[in-house]
């Protein structure tokens, strides 16, 4: 069962490699490929540094210190995950436009201007860091909560200041979690299409999409995708090593929770202000500006409602299919541990690369299935396949954690009473892990709602999601119009993200 589920994730990647190494003509110059790759590396480096600084600082503040608002900020700091990165790009590019009212006021009144343009490599790095720092924050928060206070207390007794105790004791012990969180942020950076394409930054993922849409060349797109696959494999390895290292380190010795250190009034105000700044810059300011600009715009209600229906429908179906496959993977992971590692490569792979891997078999299938109805159904099936292949590993993690909490003796008793392995899974293991299944479904739902490149490349004709609708408006520089589908997307995803972040913030150390 597990191997079959893993094959679902790996087959599109095999298709990409086979297409890239085939004999077909590929209209891609080495200089273009090098430029895409170097820009991707430079952008990833910026995001890695900024997300590490922001995520580590926020995690250490909420885990180790007491200040006003700490309890609700501990989950609010993860809320930027509800917004796709392109939403932040639209908001900040419009707010800080060179000809906009804010920049004109800054130059005329304050005599200063922005040190860089938002539509640049530096601007993209800042925006993506604000969008993806929660990956580092959540990983570091979990790692710090799992640390015992004994080591830090020993350092303090030896005369170390709080800052020195953190940098020399707590942070080194949390390095595996830091590596895992940064790796996830960089994965999302490499996979991003909507934000970097809108900001005019030429990375590998927009190059893949452009090779298909502009040149109609699957071979060129596949060859651009090869470096992305290599980056994905390295990042997934770093993330897995970081995760296993964090799990290993957190279980050492006798555990005692960290003691919250009260901060003096000025430092407490700075801590609250820093956390509020992250939530504001990562969610409230860009979306608030978009809401302000769209007030006078009457939305195209029929298109907007249809796009919302498509988004929710695809996300629900994809969540059900992906959770089913991830459950098979988790149930078989004991006998086939390699299957989970194979499937994890799909999560590190950008949606555009998944789409390229499915385009050639899709072309064959579309010729075999006559009529528009068959083509429509095939397009939806390919979309669901791409979503499931990419997000199976994301659903696998909470399901595996839920299954490990099922008492082995209960499973053994079921088998001794004559139930088959499948019967035991249906009657015992999966019902007891229903909370983990629900969590996994929400994770997939949110990611599918925000997915853009795979949807853009594989969707049937006239099937627009909210993300695609927003992208179409943004391409025409109609950012006020793009606000409606963008904010509706965030509102639909926000309840799921709120539930997930509250669950994470209230979990005890050692719990998934």
Feature annotation, model-predicted:
Residues 148-151, 245-255, 327-337, 408:
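Cytoplasmic membrane-interface regions of multi-pass membrane proteins
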Residues 65, 144-174, 201, 406-407, ...:
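Short helix-to-coil transition segments within interhelical loops
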Residues 157, 503-512:
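Short, charged juxtamembrane terminal tails flanking transmembrane helices
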Residues 148-149, 164, 195, 201-206, ...:
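Feature of multi-pass inner-membrane transport and sensor proteins
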Residues 1-23, 31-145, 173-193, 221-240, ...:
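Membrane-water interface segments at the C-terminal ends of transmembrane alpha-helices
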Residues 65-69, 145-150, 160-163, 214-218, ...:
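Juxtamembrane helix-boundary/capping and inter-helix hinge elements in multi-pass membrane proteins
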Residues 190-216, 450-479, 512:
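Glycine-rich helix-loop "coupling/hinge" segments at transmembrane-helix boundaries
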Residues 159-163, 177, 181-185, 195, ...:
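Internal, well-ordered domain-core segments that constitute the primary functional module
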């Amino acid at each position: 069962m597990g191997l079959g589920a893993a094959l679902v994730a790996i087959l599109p990647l095999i298709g990409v490699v086979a297409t890239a190494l085939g004999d077909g003509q590929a209209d891609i110059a080495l200089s273009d490929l090098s430029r895409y790759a170097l820009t991707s590396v430079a952008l990833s480096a910026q995001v890695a540094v900024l997300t590490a600084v922001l995520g580590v600082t926020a995690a250490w503040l909420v885990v180790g210190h007491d200040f006003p608002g700490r309890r609700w900020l501990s989950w609010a700091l993860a809320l930027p995950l509800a917004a796709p990165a392109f939403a932040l790009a639209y908001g900040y590019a419009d707010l800080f436009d060179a000809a906009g009212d804010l920049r004109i006021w800054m130059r005329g009144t304050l005599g200063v201007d922005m040190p860089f343009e938002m539509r640049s490599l530096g601007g993209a790095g800042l925006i993506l860091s604000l969008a993806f720092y929660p990956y580092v924050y959540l990983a570091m928060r979990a790692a710090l909560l799992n640390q015992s206070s004994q080591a830090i207390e020993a350092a303090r007794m030896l005369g170390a200041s709080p800052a020195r105790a953190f940098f020399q004791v707590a942070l080194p012990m949390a390095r595996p979690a830091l590596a895992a969180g940064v790796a996830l942020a960089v994965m999302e950076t490499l996979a991003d299409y909507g934000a970097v394409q809108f900001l005019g930054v030429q990375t590998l993922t927009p190059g893949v999409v452009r090779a298909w849409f502009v040149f109609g060349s699957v071979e060129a797109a596949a060859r651009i995708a090869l470096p992305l696959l290599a980056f994905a494999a390295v990042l997934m390895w770093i993330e897995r090593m970081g995760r296993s290292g964090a799990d290993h380190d957190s279980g050492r010795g006798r555990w005692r929770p960290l003691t919250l250190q009260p901060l003096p009034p000025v430092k407490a105000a700075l801590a609250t202000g820093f956390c509020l700044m992250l939530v504001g810059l990562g969610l409230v300011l860009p979306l608030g500006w978009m809401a302000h600009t769209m007030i006078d715009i009457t939305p195209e209600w029929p298109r907007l409602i249809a796009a919302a229906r498509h988004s929710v429908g695809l996300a629900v179906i994809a969540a059900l299919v992906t959770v089913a496959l991830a459950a098979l993977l988790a149930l078989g992971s004991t006998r086939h541990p390699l299957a989970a590692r194979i499937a994890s490569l799909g999560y590190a792979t950008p949606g555009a690369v998944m789409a390229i891997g499915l385009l050639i078999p899709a072309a064959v299938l579309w010729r075999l299935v006559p009529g528009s109805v068959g083509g429509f159904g095939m397009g939806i099936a390919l979309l669901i396949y791409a979503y499931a292949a990419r997000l199976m590993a994301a659903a696998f993690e909470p399901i595996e954690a839920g299954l490990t909490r099922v008492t082995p003796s209960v499973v053994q008793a079921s088998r001794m009473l004559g139930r088959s392995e499948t019967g035991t899974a249906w009657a015992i293991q999966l019902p007891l892990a229903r909370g983990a299944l629900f969590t996994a479904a929400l994770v997939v739902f949110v990611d599918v709602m925000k997915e853009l490149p795979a949807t853009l490349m594989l969707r049937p004709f006239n099937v627009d999601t909210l993300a695609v609708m927003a992208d179409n408006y943004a391409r025409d520089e109609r950012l006020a119009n793009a606000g409606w589908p963008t904010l509706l997307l965030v509102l639909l995803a926000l309840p799921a993200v709120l539930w997930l972040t509250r669950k994470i913030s209230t979990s005890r150390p050692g719990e998934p």
